[in-house]
Design a protein with these regions (language model features):
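Active-site loop/oxyanion-hole signature of alpha/beta-hydrolase fold enzymes
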Residues: 2, 7, 38, 44-93, ...
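Short beta-strand element of the alpha/beta-hydrolase
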Residues: 14-22
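Active-site glycine-rich loops that stabilize anionic/oxyanionic intermediates
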Residues: 22-25, 92
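Short substrate-entry loop that stabilizes the transition state in hydrolases
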Residues: 26-28, 121
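Short amphipathic alpha-helix adjacent to the substrate-entry channel of hydrolases
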Residues: 29-43
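Flexible "cap/lid" loop of the alpha/beta hydrolase fold
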Residues: 99-145
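Conserved alpha/beta-hydrolase catalytic His-Asp/Glu region
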Residues: 123, 127-131, 141-191
């Protein structure tokens, strides 16, 4: 599936483990993790449209205006590769994408491993999402006006490892490789 730059490792007929990256990253974020599972699982890595080696011409602002479009891509990968009994590992926004995919086709998934998920980023009465609506609006405006500058400033802060600046640099590079159109659609799903 060239749209999502799907790559496989591990046991060809083993239980599938699909590893899905978060915003601003690509399948390479899993490079240190997947080898630990390759002797037992069929490892399936991919890039969301707009990230890594995905087909950027496949980006459709209407399809990807909500997470359902990304969940449909996950299901298309599973269908094309005949993946069943899937262990889906989703980081950040991909955790929610995995939940949506599993809700549509629960028979396809054995387990969901949700790494750093947040169903909603905006604080509300009785709920801590981590941001105010103003925070999110400011973030989106910054993304739209200066994506590369935002990437360079935010990546080290997101990593939070001042003693390992190479991690912030790696995330900055990952953000800079991503198609900046992708996060802009999130205005429609910010609440």
């Amino acid at each position: 599936m060239s749209r999502n730059h799907v790559i496989e490792h591990g046991v060809p007929h083993g239980q599938p483990m699909v590893l899905a990256h978060g915003f601003g990253c690509d399948h390479n974020m899993w490079r240190s993790a997947w080898p630990a599972f390759a002797d037992r699982y069929r490892i399936v890595l991919f890039d969301h449209v707009g990230a890594g080696g995905s087909d950027s011409s496949a980006y459709d602002p209407h399809r990807y205006a909500s997470l359902e479009g990304y969940a449909e891509d996950v299901l298309a990968i599973c269908e094309e590769r005949d993946l069943r009994d899937v262990v889906f590992v989703g980081h950040s926004v991909s955790a929610m994408i995995g939940v949506l995919a599993a809700a549509q086709q629960p028979e396809r998934f054995a387990r969901l491993v949700l790494v750093g998920p947040s169903p909603r980023y905006i604080d509300d009465e009785g709920y801590v999402g981590g941001f105010t609506r103003e925070d999110i609006d400011g973030l989106l405006e910054s993304l739209e006006s200066n994506y590369l500058g935002w990437s360079s400033a935010m990546a080290p802060a997101i990593m939070g490892n001042a003693d390992r600046p190479e991690l912030g640099e790696e995330l900055t590079n990952s953000f800079c490789r991503a198609d900046p159109r992708s996060p802009r659609t999130s205005r429609a799903r910010r609440s």
